[in-house]
Amino acid sequence: MSYLISIIMGYFLGCFQTAYIVAKRTKHIDIRDHGSGNSGTTNAIRVLGWKLGMLTFVGDILKAVLAVIIARTLFESQLAGLYAGAGVIIGHNWPFVLKFKGGKGIASTLGMLLAFDWRIGLVAWAVASLAIYLTRYVSLGSILLVTIMPIGVFILYPGGTQELIITSILAIVAIYRHKANIGRLIRGEENKLGVKKQAT
């Protein structure tokens, strides 16, 4: 029951759509009508600029951190925290308040990892940041970040079956949601950060 409560609590926190709220408050626009149509960090950077994009990034990280800490404290369970983080990602990707049209959950995934096990989060963040810096492909960094997640859990949590299942599912879903980006990466048509081209 504690895991179910954690997921539900996380879901409602995840429905707090930072990009949507920031865009409405500052530019009076629906960010889903601009750029890629995504309510996430990358689209916020492209549509709203770096400062507001980073505000979105921090907000999406913090809601996952908050959910993990609340669940872990409330139920005295590290695993409950992971379930809450998963709930945030689900809520971010499919928020009922925006007719289930949200982002791709990468910033929230990072927040979940940093709160669940900072070692995994830090490595994932470093690898993703380096990839983005070298290639300017945010999608590549995002894919690497979520790929590292179950690998880190496998290494640091031997016997942690539920942890491995949860993080593997989240990674698979995140990669699937980047399928269009992967296609463009293969064709050499993917947008580079800081370069205006087609929407992603």
Identify the function of each model-found stretch.
Residues 1-26:
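N-terminal signal-anchor transmembrane alpha helix
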Residues 2, 6-7, 52-58, 62-96, ...:
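Nucleotide and nucleotide-moiety/phosphate-recognizing core
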Residues 10-15, 72, 88-92, 128-132, ...:
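Alpha-helical transmembrane segments of multi-pass membrane proteins
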Residues 19-22, 91-101, 128-135, 179-183:
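C-terminal ends of transmembrane helices
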Residues 21-51, 183-200:
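Cytosolic, membrane-interface loops and tails of multi-pass inner-membrane proteins
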Residues 29-40, 98-110, 137-145:
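Short, non-helical or kinked segments that cap or interrupt transmembrane helices
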Residues 45-48, 71-74, 91, 106-135, ...:
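Interfacial segments of multi-pass membrane proteins
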Residues 138-145, 159-170:
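Loop-to-transmembrane alpha-helix initiation sites
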